[in-house]
């Protein structure tokens, strides 16, 4: 990751402080591949448990639970990429950014099952009648399930009055003066904006990075299918699929940029959620002919 080696030192933050840059004749100097830029660190710990059953009596399933804690001081937009990274608030103190990673999903339960219904030829019930077998035999049902806690986020100020001249891909954190977690949070207000205050100009905020958590995610996808033998190598598969079967609302992250009133106070109502992580329930019926 690149680091701005020309950021104004903390001891010299002031209005019109271009002359206090280490190299005042230049603006932001983002340098990668040097020792100062290689101080991004991460730490991951997890506990994983899985229960499985291979196909037996028509049933196959696998369910897993993962508890994990992922900490770092810098994140990118995705695994194996440097793009989209939000730079350290203070380039001279990267450790101040050490906290929950953007990818720190603390609890995750995932699983699937496939069950061949016990009806029709070769099955336990109603296995002697070819007409009955043609109607209700050979059906199988499958399901995937995901339940996981939300992703972390950081409340940030709308403008930068730190005078650090940090450039782009940078966030100025507020001061945390109270508990930002609401007992009754919702899509119209996810966290307590009154728990934050604008930092004094020329200073950095004391809020810890990624101390807030977004909405949890829950979704179940169900499929029901059967393959009909039409003639020799000609087969017809009929299936019905329901994504987000129970139509459970799973919302995206709230807006995290705070609003400031004309008096300089943090305004309420900025932590609104206007997106979903999982679309509402969709259902479809399809057929596939192979020969």
Kindly give the residue locations of the regions a language model identified.
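Short, solvent-exposed micro-motifs at the edges of structured domains
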Residues: 1-291
């Amino acid at each position: 990751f690149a680091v701005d080696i020309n950021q104004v030192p903390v001891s010299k933050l002031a209005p019109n402080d271009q002359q206090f840059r280490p190299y005042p004749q230049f603006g932001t100097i983002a340098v990668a591949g040097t020792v100062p830029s290689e101080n991004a660190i991460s730490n991951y710990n997890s506990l994983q448990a899985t229960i499985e059953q291979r196909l037996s009596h028509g049933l196959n399933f696998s369910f897993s639970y993962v508890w994990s804690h992922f900490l770092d001081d810098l994140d990118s937009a995705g695994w194996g990429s440097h793009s989209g990274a939000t730079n350290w608030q203070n380039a001279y103190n990267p450790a101040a950014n050490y906290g929950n990673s953007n990818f720190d999903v603390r609890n995750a339960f995932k699983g699937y099952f496939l069950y061949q219904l016990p009806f029709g030829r070769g099955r336990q019930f109603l296995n002697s009648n070819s007409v009955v077998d043609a109607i209700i035999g050979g059906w199988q049902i499958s399901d995937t399930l995901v339940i996981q806690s939300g992703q972390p986020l950081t409340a940030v100020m709308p403008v930068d009055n730190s005078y650090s001249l940090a450039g782009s891909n940078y966030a100025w954190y507020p001061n945390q003066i109270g508990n930002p977690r609401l007992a009754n949070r919702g899509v119209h207000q996810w966290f307590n904006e009154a728990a934050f205050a604008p930092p004094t100009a020329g200073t950095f905020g004391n809020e810890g990075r990624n101390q807030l958590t977004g909405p949890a995610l829950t979704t179940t996808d169900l499929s029901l299918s059967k393959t009909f033998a039409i003639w020799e190598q000609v087969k017809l598969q009929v299936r019905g699929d329901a994504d987000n079967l129970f139509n459970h609302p799973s919302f995206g992250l709230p807006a995290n940029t705070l609003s400031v009133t004309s008096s300089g106070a943090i305004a309420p109502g900025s932590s609104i959620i206007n997106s979903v992580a999982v679309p509402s329930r969709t259902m479809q019926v399809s057929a596939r002919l192979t020969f």
